[in-house]
């Protein structure tokens, strides 16, 4: 390319810059902290093309799965007679709320207190203290403890 045409091209670019105008006073953002916090950007809700699971997971700990069996030893019978307390072997994953709800659902009795322990055989045992308006002996007979 000839030197004269190059000068013409530069002149045209300079003319365009003058007509357009240029920002001369760009204000710098003064940062007062040494830490940079990433700005919050727009987070859109997910709209998947298809569901990742074909069916929702079922509840594995229903009332029948929580309570495995009644515990029928002499000490358990003494608890029934003396302390109005039923003793059950329950699922290891069940907590006290699950046990209380399961006893109410299966046997229609109100539990006041639930104590749990894990036996050396790695079974969970639940001591369910019944409300004073229920008799543990009657409930045990109805269930089939005795």
Swiss-Prot record:
Annotated region (Disordered), positions in chain: 1-22
Molecular-function GO terms, alphabetical: rRNA binding; structural constituent of ribosome
Keywords: Ribonucleoprotein, Ribosomal protein, RNA-binding, rRNA-binding
Domain of life: Eukaryota
A GO biological process held by the record: translation
Entry keyword Ribonucleoprotein: yes
Coiled-coil residue windows: none
GO cellular component: cytosolic large ribosomal subunit
Function according to Swiss-Prot or TrEMBL: This protein binds to a specific region on the 26S rRNA.
NCBIfam families, per database record: PRK14548.1 (NF011118), uL23_arch (TIGR03636)
Membership in a protein family: Belongs to the universal ribosomal protein uL23 family.
HAMAP family cross-referenced by the UniProt entry: Ribosomal_uL23_A (MF_01369_A)
Stated name of the protein: Large ribosomal subunit protein uL23B
Native source organism of the sequence: Caenorhabditis elegans
């Amino acid at each position: 390319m000839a030197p004269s045409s190059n000068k013409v091209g530069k002149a045209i670019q300079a003319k365009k810059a003058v007509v357009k105008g240029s920002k001369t006073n760009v204000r710098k953002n003064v940062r007062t902290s040494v830490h940079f916090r990433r700005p919050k950007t727009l987070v859109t809700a997910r709209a998947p093309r298809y569901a990742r699971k074909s069916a929702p997971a079922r509840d594995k700990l229903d009332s029948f799965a929580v309570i495995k069996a009644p515990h029928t030893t002499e000490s358990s019978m003494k608890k029934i007679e003396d302390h109005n307390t039923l003793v059950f072997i329950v699922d290891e994953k069940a907590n006290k709320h699950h046990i209380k709800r399961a006893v109410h659902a299966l046997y229609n009795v109100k539990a006041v207190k639930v104590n749990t322990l894990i036996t050396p055989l790695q079974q969970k045992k639940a001591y369910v203290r019944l409300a004073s308006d229920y008799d543990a002996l009657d409930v045990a007979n109805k269930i089939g403890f005795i």
